[in-house]
């Protein structure tokens, strides 16, 4: 397993790969949410997983509560891996982090990803229209998490030690969402593909379509018959779609009958 700094893990190093795909996890989880992704792409792509402080291999580090404060260290660790074309996939919170990475790279290095894939995330310019929850008492916080995003694993809910480990990370990640401040800039030049779940009650289709404003390139919206965490329930279809847009071939695919598409 390869490691760039502390922030980037490349599970299957492919030094001759023509492209890299950086994957940004959703709130409360680490890079293992993308377990198996590296195995499902052919040798022409190297998959690199973003590992933020406070989770998995960085458990002893305090999590960030601000996307802006996260950027310098993340970009420093990412920079050695930007020697070939690259793309970003971010899910929920991870999509906003990926978007801000792209804009920071444009400002600092005049580099942009070839493609941004955003899953289950409202467009970054839209206001956050949900009541604050980062500081709620534990029981109310857990109840609100289940209401918005689905139930946490039973082993987390029932184990006091696990709750003590996981809840600070979740609160910090929710703080990143709630405290995010969008600053208007010119649209990115890269293509943007947005994925949504038809059963996701947290993110409206109109909020997904608003990503169109963030690119001067091609925009594509694809909907899965899933909820907010369709990256698990529809993993094969999602990988098939990402690979197709990157002109790659996943090692394993399934029919895409559960996918609806809007392209511009």
What are these regions (language model features)?
Residues 1-89, 93-264:
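Domain-scale detector for complete catalytic domains at protein termini or as standalone homologs
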């Amino acid at each position: 397993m390869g490691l760039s700094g502390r922030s980037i893990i490349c599970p299957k190093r492919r030094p001759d790969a023509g492209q890299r795909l950086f994957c940004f996890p959703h709130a409360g989880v680490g890079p293992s949410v993308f377990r198996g992704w590296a195995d499902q792409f052919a040798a022409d792509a190297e998959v690199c997983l973003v590992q933020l402080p406070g989770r998995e291999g960085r458990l002893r580090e305090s999590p960030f509560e601000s996307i802006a404060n996260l950027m310098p260290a993340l970009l420093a660790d990412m920079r050695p891996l930007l020697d070939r074309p690259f793309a970003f996939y971010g899910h929920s919170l991870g999509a906003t982090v990926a978007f801000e990475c792209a804009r920071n790279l444009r400002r600092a290095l005049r580099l942009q990803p070839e493609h941004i894939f955003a899953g289950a995330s409202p467009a970054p310019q839209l206001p956050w229209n949900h009541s604050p929850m980062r500081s709620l008492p534990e029981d109310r916080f857990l109840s609100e998490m289940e209401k918005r995003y689905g139930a946490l694993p039973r082993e987390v809910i029932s184990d006091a030690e696990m709750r003590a480990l996981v809840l600070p990370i979740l609160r910090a990640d929710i703080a990143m969402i709630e405290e995010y401040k969008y600053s208007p800039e010119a649209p990115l030049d890269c293509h943007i593909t947005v994925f949504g779940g038809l059963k996701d009650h947290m993110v409206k289709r109109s909020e997904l379509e608003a990503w169109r404003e963030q690119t001067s390139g091609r925009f594509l919206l694809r909907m899965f018959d899933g909820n907010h965490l369709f990256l698990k329930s529809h993993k094969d279809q999602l990988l098939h779609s990402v690979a197709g847009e990157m002109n790659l071939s996943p090692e394993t695919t399934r029919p895409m009958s559960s996918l609806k598409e809007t392209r511009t």
